[in-house]
């Protein structure tokens, strides 16, 4: 049962300032049958916000900025107890999900700020432009579910095989890189 709302706004001020924004609020759930409870779908981030603007300066210079925010996506946590069992891990070589908690976890929201500066030259029959674009200026981190991994060390080697458990560790999954780009545009 997906549903949502979207608001769009756009402003143009005296050919110098151009602003556009959008806010989307939504909820996306489903259920396996009429008796089961609703479950968040994989793309149920709940909201998306974008604000972008460009200001045109004299002599064909322009400055642009974009702010983007998105709510955290749902995820399914691991079944840590089952994943630790030596026989279970060796059978699959990766962790098991706890499907009784399907999509009950939620990642943190993510926001990003991008900026761009352009300089344009108008020649007789063409246009030449140069720009520098900086994505994720604030170095905001985008988080994914951590990876649950076996260290290969058995914590209780003297126990019977069905009771033996691996020592486990989590590997953090996040990124937050500042991405600079230099560019040239040419039109004729």
Language model features with spans:
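Flexible, solvent-exposed coil segments and beta strand-coil junctions
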Residues: 26-34, 90-99, 158-165
